[in-house]
């Protein structure tokens, strides 16, 4: 399976566009726990634990895109975009949301 952020694949011809595929990954977060754990990780304004969480979520979202594209008969996903955000649930925590979107295609 070819996955790319570009709208074309060099050297390949798109035979058919099979549709938009999306994947959503949601992680629960406990503000107090994450805040205390994050104190150890913060170096130069960066929080390693959250960076690893988002990196893992992006990988999982792309894997899910591939699975959904395969179900449509695709052998590639083009134009992939990944967005991240948070959803405030209540005062005790937030949900971390990672969304991936692309176009499932069959190429030769």
UniProtKB/Swiss-Prot annotation:
SUPFAM superfamilies: YbjQ-like. Pfam families: YbjQ_1 (PF01906). InterPro entries: UPF0145_dom_sf, UPF0145_YbjQ-like. Belongs to the UPF0145 family. This is UPF0145 protein alr2488. It comes from Nostoc sp. (strain PCC 7120 / SAG 25.82 / UTEX 2576).
């Amino acid at each position: 399976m070819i996955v790319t952020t570009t709208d074309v694949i060099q050297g390949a011809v798109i035979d058919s566009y099979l549709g938009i595929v999306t994947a959503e990954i949601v992680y629960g977060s406990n503000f107090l726990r994450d805040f205390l754990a994050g104190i150890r990780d913060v170096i130069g304004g960066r929080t390693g634990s959250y960076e690893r969480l988002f990196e893992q979520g992006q990988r999982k979202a792309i894997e899910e895109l591939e699975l959904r594209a395969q179900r449509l008969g695709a052998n590639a996903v083009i134009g992939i975009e990944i967005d991240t955000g948070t959803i405030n649930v209540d005062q005790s925590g937030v949900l971390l949301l990672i969304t991936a979107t692309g176009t499932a295609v069959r190429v030769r």
